[in-house]
UniProtKB/Swiss-Prot annotation:
Its cofactor is pyridoxal 5'-phosphate; Mg(2+). InterPro entries: Ala_racemase/Decarboxylase_C, Arg_decrbxlase, De-COase2_CS, De-COase2_N, De-COase2_pyr-phos_BS, Orn/DAP/Arg_de-COase, PLP-binding_barrel. It catalyses: L-arginine + H(+) = agmatine + CO2. Coiled coil: none annotated. This is Arginine decarboxylase. Keywords: Decarboxylase, Lyase, Magnesium, Putrescine biosynthesis, Pyridoxal phosphate, Spermidine biosynthesis. It comes from the Eukaryota. Its EC number is 4.1.1.19. GO terms for biological process: arginine catabolic process; putrescine biosynthetic process; spermidine biosynthetic process. It holds the Pfam family Orn_Arg_deC_N. Belongs to the Orn/Lys/Arg decarboxylase class-II family. SpeA subfamily. One of its GO terms (molecular function) is arginine decarboxylase activity. It is an enzyme of class 4 (lyase).
Length: 502
């Protein structure tokens, strides 16, 4: 433990669902081109995951997207076993080696497209392609004005990290024309941001991009593809809300329909040929296919304070200073009157004054503990004691759930056994690392604790929990914090018979 359980059949289903949604939208709206997606390797670069996507996507011309030289090498190797028409979209910062590799891919009959993220990359592409005697296929990333305001929207808009402005796009077109390579410009790429919250925002961005696409056609580019990037969101918390970074208010079918409709509207109005629609929907494809299983090895116990005896209580009160004795008298009076909020105020004041006495040496540790017991007993007596326990779980949050630590990304976490028993406790999760940030204390639905079972009352004292929808990015981002090592991995696939698994 911890253990990552992967279900390639779920991966296949997600890919087929995405393809089916676009096929349905294309057929129902009379769109005159097709959809073919690409999987961004950065979402989960595990070899088996990438190979499964290429295998399952081969009938649909499904390709890969790379953002670095190592990712490009992995993608080239995997796509050599895929569809000949699959796209190999080459994004990211590009130096001489990167561009040379992308051109080698074309020599190997892979359908690589070099997407310009910076204007300076064009000179390298022209120069290297001539030296290698390879006719490149070029795309460019447009920096749209459309953006969304959530956490994931920072890469979009005019001040986004990537892409070319309209002025830069025109300069690229002019230079390609002067070089006799304008026909090589075949793809327009853009990215509004991950977790696009609404189809209205999506349609706005796709419409703007299609206008740019149509202008490139008018200027003589050999345009064929419009790559709408990522952004197909996951409803992590089940709220179907447009006001949350962990939810979206649309289905895959509604997403596909909005994209096709937006492209169709602009192209028909301009009288242009419909482009092949491409998307880079990594999160939507791989999030569901794996489960992180981990064990709660222990839990903090709830200490039940007993009511002190009257004699012991009187002896303790006599050792307190005058201010602390006043707090105790006020606490007692408020409890008799049933003023529970006032009780808490005087209880906190009493504890703080006694801490000060302990610091100056006038109160010993036994007396300080007795005061704590009095205050705890009062809290329990009036029903405001904190019932939340800390469950110590055998993992590192930094390694296995880095997005929670980094920006409080929420994931569904539930017990995965003893489901016929009603949970009787509430708890937060604390990992086994030596860092105070290694805990999970925010959960789906705005909860600050989870309903959990008592440890040790079944299954040999073992207690297992599962985290879901973590198939994208968590494994890719996790390191070896505290040298804990990575989780073990198990692949579960349905075999020939309906209820048999391997």
């Amino acid at each position: 433990m911890p253990l990552v359980v992967r279900f390639p059949d779920v991966l296949k289903n997600r890919l087929e669902t995405l393809q089916s949604a676009f096929d349905m939208a294309i057929n129902s709206q009379g769109y005159e081109a097709h959809y073919q997606g690409v999987y961004p390797v950065k979402c989960n670069q595990d070899r088996f995951v990438v190979e499964d996507i290429v295998k399952f996507g081969s009938p649909y011309r499904f390709g890969l997207e790379a953002g670095s030289k190592p990712e490009l090498l992995l993608a080239m190797n995997c796509l050599s076993k895929g569809s000949a028409d699959a796209l190999l979209v080459c994004n990211g910062f590009k130096d001489t080696e990167y561009i040379s590799l992308a051109l080698v891919a074309r020599k190997l009959l892979l359908n690589s497209v070099i997407v310009l993220e910076q204007e300076e990359e064009l000179d390298l592409v022209i120069d290297i392609s001539r030296k290698m005697s390879v006719r490149p296929v070029i795309g460019l990333r447009a920096k749209l004005r459309t953006k969304h305001s959530g956490h994931f929207g920072s890469t979009s808009g005019e001040k986004g990290k990537f892409g070319l402005t309209t002025t830069q796009i025109l300069r690229v077109v002019k230079k390609l024309d002067e070089s006799g390579m304008l026909d090589c410009l075949q793809l327009l790429h853009f990215h509004i941001g991950s977790q696009i919250p609404t189809t209205e925002l999506l349609a706005d961005g796709v419409g703007e991009a299609t206008q740019i696409y149509s202008e490139l056609v008018r200027l003589g580019a050999g345009m064929k593809f419009i790559d709408i990037g990522g952004g197909l969101g996951i409803d992590y918390d089940g709220s179907k809300s447009s006001n949350s970074d962990v939810s979206v208010c649309y289905s895959i079918e509604e997403y596909a329909s909005a994209v096709v409709q937006a492209v169709l509207y602009v192209c028909d109005r301009k009288g242009g040929k419909h482009p092949v629609i491409c998307s880079e929907s990594g999160r939507a494809i791989v999030s569901h296919h794996s489960i992180l299983i981990f064990e709660a090895v222990s839990a903090s116990t709830s200490h039940v304070s007993t009511q002190p005896s009257s004699g012991g209580l009187q002896s303790l009160v006599e050792t307190l200073n005058e201010d602390a004795r006043a707090d105790y008298r006020n606490l007692s009076a408020a409890a008799v009157r049933g003023e529970y909020d006032t009780c808490l105020i005087y209880s906190d004041q009493l504890k703080q004054r006694c801490v000060e006495q302990f610091k100056d040496g006038s109160l010993d540790i036994e007396q300080l503990a007795a005061v704590d017991s009095i205050c705890d007993w009062v809290s329990k007596a009036i029903g405001v004691a904190d019932p939340v326990r800390t469950y110590h779980v055998n993992l590192s949050v930094f390694t296995s759930i880095p997005d929670f630590w980094g920006f409080s990304q929420l994931f569904p976490i539930v017990p995965i056994h003893r489901l016929d028993e009603k949970p009787t406790m509430r708890g937060i999760l604390s990992d086994l690392t030596c860092d105070s940030d290694g805990k999970v204390d925010k959960f789906i639905g705005g909860e600050s604790s989870l309903p959990l079972h008592e440890i040790g009352s079944g299954d040999g004292g073992r207690y297992y929990l599962g985290m879901f929808l973590g198939g994208a990015y968590e494994e890719a981002l996790g390191g070896l914090h505290n040298l804990f090592g990575g989780p073990s991995v198990v692949r579960v696939m349905q075999s020939d018979s309906p209820h048999s698994f391997a």
